[in-house]
Amino acid sequence: MKSLNNKVGFSSLNISIVLLILMISLLARYLVSLNGYSGQSKPPMFGDYEAQRHWMEITTNLDIHQWYFNSTDNDLMYWGLDYPPLTAYLSWVFGKIGEFIEPKSMELFTSRGYETDSGKLFMRMTVIVSDLFIWLPSVWFFVKTFYKQRNISQQISAFLFISLQPGLLLIDHGHFQYNGVSLGLGLFAITFIIRDQQLLASFFFVLSLNYKQMCLYYSPAFFFYLLLSNFEFTLKFSKIFSSIFKILKIGIVVIFTFILCWIPFLSIEQASQVLFRLFPFARGLYEDKVANFWCFISIIINVKNLFTTDQLIKICLILTLVTMLPLVYGIKRIPKNKFVFIHSLINSSFSFFLFSFQVHEKTILLVSLPISLLILHHPNMVWWFILISTFSMFPLLFKDGLVIPYFAIMILYIVIGYQFKNSITRSNNQFKHQNSQENLLASSDKSFYSIYLNYWFYLNIIGMVVCHLLYQFAPHPPHLPSLWLLLVCNFSFIHFILTFFYFIKEMTTFSPIKIKSN
């Protein structure tokens, strides 16, 4: 136990610092949770808060084989379960606890739209507890692994920056979701990759996929990294056999973990129904307006009218796969490199968000995670991207009545984060002289895009303020009801696409710096 504590860094921290970090993290979540949420007091469908509560109701009251099927007891048109089995299992656990604490909150049918103060407190606490046991430990584990050569103050700064991302706070503890669970499981997988513990990485990544299918955004990066880092292109039989054996072990772990998660749903009937619920292509190219490529070009070309749904699915698939080719090149060029791997996650998740079929505005959180992990290497870029990604979700947060916490968090983030990133930049100037392995990354923020951010920062802040004012107060032209919404989305998209190309350039021009195995 002592050696394990030393590895993850707990022994180097004073207990008071640990408690202070936890207090700050939990207090921020609690304060956000005091505000509105998705669909509050808006019958008959309410919103995501009711969806999560309803899943607890369904899993608590119905047999497990009825969870994903339409029936008189389970109307799939009313927030039918459409997440993978681990979400259902966690809903069952929370549902049983909720049933014990407040039975009426989980009664079948009669609990629809249940919004008592005690019920809301319980629901909010389930998200906070999930963060406490999954998201926050995963961030700390990553920081102590990836930034092990940094001093403790830099590690704490990185932990707070990653764990207190405004977008994730507002969506999970305001709007109401459990993204911290899927992202936390995914981050454990990322950290185990960095530690060269690939079997554990595979196990945790499959868990993240089985909690939320959107973690597929990371799957190409994991697949090609694991494949290309283990397979040696050689004519020696012994090395070929060794490569195949390594890949086979990973495959066994992946299959075993999937089977473990899907045990109740392994019949053809059950599995096909669950998959049908997980991938609802009938919903269309995107829901509402989202800051991606398809929404951007819709102001010029209405692709929904030009192509059928099947054609759009194929076009999206081709474009998404083509824009992922840089990650294959990057990993093949420098295999087993921690920086290339994180950049490949950025490439993969960005390609899905910008070009794939059926994208939600909240899925930008999947892009924000790998980008935020590079905070001590790209402080300017990371700080600005997290700001823009949160801004891109403003229309959704406005609809949820989260304007006050949104502006409070954004202002704090701009003021404190601006000073914070400058402090990191100064620390990097000292650190790069001490560690030749990370010299390139520590100084890589001195790029064209960094200069762009520094000189155009105030102009873009003004642009964001104008977008906010127009969206909230200016009447839209009668024939253009989505004008201000499109303005917010397209303003965000321009920054997203620039960031996308920036990190592709970084990944494909790295010097061959090899990561040392822990």
UniProtKB/Swiss-Prot annotation:
Reaction catalysis annotation: an alpha-D-Man-(1->2)-alpha-D-Man-(1->2)-alpha-D-Man-(1->3)-[alpha-D-Man-(1->2)-alpha-D-Man-(1->3)-[alpha-D-Man-(1->2)-alpha-D-Man-(1->6)]-alpha-D-Man-(1->6)]-beta-D-Man-(1->4)-beta-D-GlcNAc-(1->4)-alpha-D-GlcNAc-diphospho-di-trans,poly-cis-dolichol + a di-trans,poly-cis-dolichyl beta-D-glucosyl phosphate = an alpha-D-Glc-(1->3)-alpha-D-Man-(1->2)-alpha-D-Man-(1->2)-alpha-D-Man-(1->3)-[alpha-D-Man-(1->2)-alpha-D-Man-(1->3)-[alpha-D-Man-(1->2)-alpha-D-Man-(1->6)]-alpha-D-Man-(1->6)]-beta-D-Man-(1->4)-beta-D-GlcNAc-(1->4)-alpha-D-GlcNAc-diphospho-di-trans,poly-cis-dolichol + a di-trans,poly-cis-dolichyl phosphate + H(+)
Transmembrane stretches, start-end: 8-28, 127-147, 174-194, 215-235, 247-267, 311-331, 339-359, 368-388, 396-416, 451-471, 484-504
Glycosylation sites: 70
Domain of life from the UniProt record: Eukaryota
Topology feature Lumenal, residues: 29-126, 195-214, 268-310, 360-367, 417-450, 505-518
Family, as annotated: Belongs to the ALG6/ALG8 glucosyltransferase family.
The protein, known as: Probable dolichyl pyrophosphate Man9GlcNAc2 alpha-1,3-glucosyltransferase
Organism: Dictyostelium discoideum
Lineage: Eukaryota, Amoebozoa, Evosea, Eumycetozoa, Dictyostelia
